[in-house]
């Protein structure tokens, strides 16, 4: 039998990971794809749109559905809303489509939805944003012109298309960049402000929907611990997408007029709607689902799925508005739950068992090469961590049982205090 060095390498990685208490996560494309989105999500007008377009495109049906639901939120503006704990939730959502470059067909799905939206609202193209780089720039881009300031109560409705989401993540890493904070405020529906400048920027009544694209590798490599834990990432519906079929001759044109007509009717019906509540049966269903949606989740999954109930509320509102319904009915809530459940499975698939503690993971990976002393940690973190932080962090990791205190030869060959992975040295 021939020797397989690759198998030896994989076995070594798993042994080290076992010692460190880590889970080895296979690349996304090698792991089984998440269970498909339940058919309950494909109801009403959005479901009919997907069924109309799907035979003629390589885009993933879930990507078509996600783009449609998030995109139409721009058309509804603030004419209708739902309420949770005294807070208004408008039909605004952020979608993050995660798929491989090219074969993920992320842009293809967006390209199929935009003609429908633009057919319903002629001037929508003028309110599509791209290339966001700062909170200040975003506010300037959506602020009313001098001619428009005479209408202070007018809702500013915009759609941000971000096909290079990784670039946005990198921009947000710059010191003093306010884009993350402003996007979070936009999702919340609050006034957008940047006050730390001579001429403060301020705009209110903004409905901003976001459709972004990224590859799994870009997301894993560029989403910082801050983005994961400060509520930025969990404001997005994270959705794994892939090519649904091969169409060597390309997808053909589709008559979207019936969809456009029905969507126009739904938008008109929503005008002046105001508060949209769940009907009696939907309230009973919500009571059953609420505990599941708000349950505590561990690690990174918990950080990225921390707004499950808010997403389901907004999605159910969108489904109801697209049905021209006066109330959120059980089928709207079931559709929203089915959509969200796929997003949560996508997060689990992409991030696996990651803990969300990037510093801790960095330390464990470094300790796999041998014991480390204080000076080694200085180098590991580029002198951005002081002695007090290192000692506190290592004490916490010792308490987890994954790391033990030991000694090693210092830079001048003297014995110095150090730490190692449990089981790799004599304690």
Mark where each language-model region is.
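Phosphate-handling catalytic cores of nucleic-acid transaction enzymes
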Residues: 2-427
């Amino acid at each position: 039998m021939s020797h397989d060095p690759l198998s030896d390498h994989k076995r070594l990685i798993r042994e080290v990971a076992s010692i460190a208490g880590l889970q080895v996560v296979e690349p996304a494309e090698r792991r089984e794809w998440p269970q498909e989105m339940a058919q309950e999500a494909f109801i009403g007008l959005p479901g009919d749109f997907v069924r109309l377009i799907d035979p003629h495109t390589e885009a993933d049906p879930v990507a078509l559905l996600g783009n449609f639901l998030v995109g139409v939120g721009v058309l509804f503006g603030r004419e209708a809303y739902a309420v949770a704990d005294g807070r208004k939730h408008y039909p605004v959502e952020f979608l993050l489509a995660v798929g491989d470059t090219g074969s993920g067909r992320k842009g293809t799905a967006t390209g199929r939805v935009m003609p429908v939206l633009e057919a319903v609202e002629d001037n929508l193209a003028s309110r599509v944003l791209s290339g966001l780089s700062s909170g200040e720039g975003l506010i300037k881009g959506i602020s009313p012109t001098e001619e428009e300031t005479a209408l202070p109560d007018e809702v500013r409705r915009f759609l941000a298309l971000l096909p290079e989401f990784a670039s946005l993540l990198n921009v947000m890493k710059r010191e003093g960049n306010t884009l993350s904070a402003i996007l979070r405020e936009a999702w919340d529906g609050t006034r957008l402000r940047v006050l730390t400048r001579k001429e403060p920027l301020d705009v209110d009544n903004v409905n901003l929907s976001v459709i972004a694209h990224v590859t799994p590798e870009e997301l894993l490599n560029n989403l910082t611990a801050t983005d994961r834990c400060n509520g930025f990432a969990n404001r997005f519906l994270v959705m794994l997408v892939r090519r649904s079929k091969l169409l060597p001759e390309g997808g053909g044109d589709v008559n979207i007029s019936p969809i456009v007509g029905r969507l126009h009717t739904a938008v008109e019906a929503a005008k002046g709607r105001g508060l949209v509540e769940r009907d009696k049966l939907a309230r009973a269903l919500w009571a059953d689902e609420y505990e599941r949606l708000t349950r505590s989740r561990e690690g990174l999954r918990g950080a990225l799925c921390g707004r499950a109930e808010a997403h389901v509320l907004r999605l159910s509102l969108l489904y109801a508005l697209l049905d021209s319904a006066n109330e959120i009915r059980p089928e709207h809530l079931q559709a929203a739950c089915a959509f969200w459940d796929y997003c949560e499975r996508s997060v689990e698939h992409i991030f696996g068992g990651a803990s969300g503690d990037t510093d801790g993971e960095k330390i464990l990976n470094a300790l796999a090469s041998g014991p480390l002393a204080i000076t080694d940690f200085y180098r590991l973190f580029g002198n951005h961590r002081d002695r007090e932080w290192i000692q506190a962090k290592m004490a916490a990791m010792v308490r987890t049982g994954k790391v033990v205190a030991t000694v090693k030869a210092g830079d001048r060959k003297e014995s110095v205090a150090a730490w190692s992975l449990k089981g790799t040295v004599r304690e």
